[in-house]
Design a protein with these regions (language model features):
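Accessory N-terminal region flanking or inserted into the helicase ATPase core
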Residues: 1-17, 21-25, 30, 37, ...
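Hydrophobic residues on the short alpha-helix immediately C-terminal to a glycine-rich phosphate/catalytic loop
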Residues: 19, 41-45, 70, 261
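Catalytic P-loop NTPase motifs of RecA-like helicase/translocase cores
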Residues: 45, 94, 247-253, 257, ...
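Conserved RecA-like helicase ATPase core segment
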Residues: 256-328
């Protein structure tokens, strides 16, 4: 990072100093320099490493696109220490760890062919395999009150599975939870038992054929891998430093994992964007993310906006709080 481009604020300098602030929860509105502070901290960590003997850094982001600033920064570095940095989402970390520790997971005998390599399904391939379950059910008259085309129905069923894993309840409860939330015509209640039948058969298909769709990956990691002592020893030695940006955009299960994981890092920076959590339809939970502040030693609030003018900031505040709207 070119130090001549800007002068870091005191908050950014504080966040960058990983030795004096090894466990920091950084929060503030958009455009207050939080990600820039994270880049400064990453630069400080890399420059502190002896040549060729770097400590590993995990940069965790909720969406791959949010890792672009870190990827761009690393692409401009000439130091070998930059090779010690991994920019990952929790989803990509899950997949790596499940693939690496598959022999350990196989020992739990959850799958029909535990010693054969698994196939990781994308959203599209998950919907394809779901259609193999749903089509025969449609032929039997199931989902008779649903007017969605097949691909939309399969997409919704896969989404229900994923949401159950993200929020943290069993896929066996999906039908009952949908039924209890339904306020419409009781004649449509039968569709929820059809939903439960479909997701149960789909999960069985996955277990019989070593198919790992997203919700199953999450369950394997949370319920079997994360609690294993051998895995814990490996993962704690794998990364010494953590930078977790936009934690408010991740679902609760990620925050649960990080609450357990944070004490093992040599240094950690968790960044929370105020008035955010825009991916709530994908499971983002800002309220859950705030729990991470209790697992860090220091909390720092950024206030100086580096991008927006004062009138624009006031307008934004009006949208957030109409009763206390003040425009200069």
């Amino acid at each position: 990072m070119d130090k001549n481009e800007f002068v870091p604020s005191k908050d950014q300098e504080m966040a960058a100093n990983f030795k004096e602030n090894p466990s920091l929860f950084l929060r503030g509105n958009a455009s207050t320099g939080k990600t820039t502070a994270a880049l400064l901290r990453l630069e400080t960590i890399l420059h502190s490493q002896a040549s060729g003997i770097g400590e590993s850094v995990l940069v965790l982001v909720p969406q791959r696109s949010l890792g672009s600033p870190f990827q761009d920064f690393l692409s401009k570095q000439m130091s070998m220490a930059s090779d010690q940095v991994s920019v990952l989402t929790m989803s990509s970390l899950l997949r790596r760890m499940i693939d690496l520790f598959w022999p350990l997971l196989a020992s739990y005998q959850l799958f029909k062919h535990p010693y054969e390599k698994p196939a990781f399904l994308t959203l599209e391939t998950s919907q394809f395999y779901m259609s193999q379950i749903v089509e025969p059910m449609l032929a039997q008259g199931k989902f008779s009150t649903v007017s969605l085309p097949l691909y939309r129905l399969c997409s919704q069923l896969v989404d229900n599975l994923n949401k159950s894993a993200l929020v943290g309840f069993s896929h066996e409860e999906i039908g009952a939870r949908l039924a209890s939330a339904w306020l419409g015509d009781t004649s449509r209640q039968n569709v929820f038992s059809d939903v439960q039948e479909a997701v149960t058969k789909f999960r069985q298909l996955c277990l019989e054929n070593n198919l790992l769709e997203y919700s199953l990956q999450v369950e394997l990691f949370k319920n079997y891998l994360w609690s294993n002592q051998s895995f814990q020893k490996y993962i704690q030695n794998q990364y010494q430093h953590l930078i977790y940006d936009n934690c408010e955009e991740d679902p609760p299960y990620v925050h649960d994992i990080l609450i357990d994981w944070l004490p093992s890092f040599k240094s950690s920076l968790v960044i929370f964007d105020e008035n955010s959590g825009f991916r709530s339809f994908l499971g983002a939970d800002p309220t859950s993310a705030l729990r991470l502040s209790k697992s860090t030693v220091t909390t720092l609030q950024t206030t100086h906006n580096f991008v927006s003018s004062i009138p624009l900031q006031e307008l934004g505040n009006c949208f957030l709080n109409l009763q206390n709207c003040k425009v200069s």
